[in-house]
Design a protein with these regions (language model features):
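Conserved AMP-binding/adenylate-forming
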Residues: 1-74, 81-84, 97-98
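Glycine-centered tight turns that cap/initiate beta-strands
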Residues: 14, 106-109, 161, 167
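Residues embedded in well-ordered beta-strands
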Residues: 16-18, 36, 111, 125-127, ...
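Conserved beta-strand termini and adjacent loop/short-helix elements that scaffold enzyme active sites
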Residues: 20, 113-115, 165
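Short, ordered coil/turn segments that flank beta-strands lining enzyme active or ligand-binding pockets
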Residues: 22-23, 71, 87, 166, ...
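AMP-binding/adenylate-forming catalytic core of the ANL superfamily
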Residues: 41, 47, 66-157, 174, ...
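AMP-binding/adenylate-forming catalytic domain of the ANL superfamily
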Residues: 151-175, 192-193
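Acidic/polar alpha-helix N-cap and adjacent early helical turns
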Residues: 183-193
């Protein structure tokens, strides 16, 4: 029952949903597999406002979300498609990493972005805005944060590095501007382990 309360819910009558992998193959509704969320139905748009081009892919609308669906049809959004980190053929949820890091008492805000990696394609880089009255040095907080993830996420999801910024850029509505962070750190070299 508690797990169901954590889900976003089920689709309404007349709407279908599915999750697909990078090759657009449908994934099982097992609550474990997650992929790009697609919907279709009478109440689903087929084109964006003031455009003539169809937004549909094989009659399905790509929501731009990454989700999983359990065997009861309960869906949970785990990330935005553009923010998921694809590492070694697996997907890492940036939102899960951000939520955990934000729980640390010295963290004001956390953003997790993908950094190019020669072996794994992408690896997570954690970008931290510290609270104004923080007590720890950057190195102390970095060490604490990397330990803070132990037991909370799969070990291979742990960010390869942590960097600190004065302010994480936000939109006018308060959403993180990950595009700006990706641009800022596009040449960043992850430490070799």
């Amino acid at each position: 029952q508690e797990k169901i309360l954590q889900k976003q819910g089920r689709v309404i009558f007349g709407v279908d949903m599915k999750i697909v992998d990078d090759q657009h193959q449908e994934l099982p509704h097992d609550g474990v597999a997650f992929g790009d969320l697609y919907v279709r139905g009478l109440w689903v748009i087929n084109q964006y406002y003031k455009t003539l081009d169809s937004a549909l892919v094989d009659d399905w609308f790509p929501t731009g979300d990454v989700a999983n669906i359990d065997d009861q049809g309960n869906m949970q959004i785990t990330d935005r498609s553009k923010d998921v980190i694809k590492s070694g053929g697996e997907w890492i949820s940036s939102i899960d990493i951000e939520n955990i890091a934000s729980g640390h008492p010295e963290v004001m805000m956390a953003a997790c972005i993908a950094i190019a990696h020669p072996k794994w394609d992408e690896r997570p880089l954690l970008v931290i805005e510290k609270k104004p009255n923080h007590q720890l040095s950057d190195q102390e907080l970095k060490d604490q944060l990397l330990k803070y993830f132990e037991g909370k996420i799969a070990k291979w999801w742990t960010p390869d590095d942590v960097v600190f910024v004065e302010k994480i850029p936000l939109t006018a509505t308060g959403k993180m501007q990950k595009l700006k962070l990706r641009e800022q750190f596009k040449e960043y070299q992850l430490p070799t382990i």
